[in-house]
UniProtKB/Swiss-Prot annotation:
Alphabetized UniProt keyword annotations: Cytoplasm, Hydrolase, Protease, Serine protease
Full protein name: ATP-dependent Clp protease proteolytic subunit 1
Gene responsible for this protein: clpP1
Gene3D superfamilies noted in UniProt: 2-enoyl-CoA Hydratase, Chain A, domain 1
Compartments where found: Cytoplasm
GO molecular function per UniProt: ATP-dependent peptidase activity; ATPase binding; serine-type endopeptidase activity
Function recorded in the entry: Cleaves peptides in various proteins in a process that requires ATP hydrolysis. Has a chymotrypsin-like activity. Plays a major role in the degradation of misfolded proteins.
Primary localisation category: cytoplasm
Pfam families: CLP_protease (PF00574)
SUBUNIT field: Fourteen ClpP subunits assemble into 2 heptameric rings which stack back to back to give a disk-like structure with a central cavity, resembling the structure of eukaryotic proteasomes.
Species the sequence originates in: Shouchella clausii (strain KSM-K16)
Example GO biological process: protein quality control for misfolded or incompletely synthesized proteins
């Protein structure tokens, strides 16, 4: 089911202008990740990050996250761009940051990673399905184990937890409330409502 995208009207010196809500938020340097992380979403978010960095490399960018996660490679495309560009990135979890969305949340600039009071964070090991020849399945299994190690080390580095603790906690779905995510080091602040 496609949910219609809201439009907002804004008065300019040239008259009234209509924006879809995401374009209007982008004017205020706000990016919203509110869906599964796919290549299409990653390309859009990456383009927005690059655009905002080129227009003002000194001004913060805010990324609001309410996502179940998704593709690891698409997630890394967003994460690497966040880390590559000059502006600080404020990340805000507004509902759920699960799987790679949690990695994006923790990937924000330290001191600027936030959640709303009822937000949840979930970390787990990468998922994947395999079929085909045994040699192909072995290649895929090695790839997913490498990704898991990279993700665990990144989360450990950003949270202050040990890689072994991250590996143990993410063996299965590991849910955290906003307060628990703050104690764990995923976020720095819980925003008041």
């Amino acid at each position: 089911m496609n949910i219609p995208i809201p439009y907002v009207m804004e008065q300019t010196r040239y008259g009234e202008r209509s924006y879809d809500i995401y374009s209007r938020l982008l004017k205020d340097r706000i990016i919203f990740i509110g869906d599964e992380i796919t290549d299409t979403l990653a390309n859009s978010v990456t383009a927005q990050l690059l655009f905002l960095a080129s227009t003002d490399p000194e001004k913060d960018i805010s990324i609001y996250i309410n996502s179940p996660g998704g593709s690891v490679s698409a997630g890394f495309a967003i994460l690497d761009t966040m880390l590559y560009i000059k502006p600080d990135i404020q990340t805000i979890c507004t509902g759920m940051a699960a799987s790679f969305a949690a990695v994006l949340l923790v990937g924000g600039t330290k001191g600027k990673r936030c959640a709303l009071p009822h937000a949840e964070v979930m970390i787990h090991q990468p998922h994947g399905g395999m079929k085909g020849q045994a040699s192909d399945m072995d290649i895929y299994a090695q790839r997913i184990l490498k990704q898991r190690k990279e993700i665990n080390h990144f989360i450990a580095e950003r949270t202050g937890q040990t890689p072994d603790k991250i590996a143990t906690d993410s063996e299965r779905d590991y849910f955290m409330s906003a307060a628990e995510a703050k104690d764990y080091g995923v976020i720095d602040n819980i925003l008041p409502v």
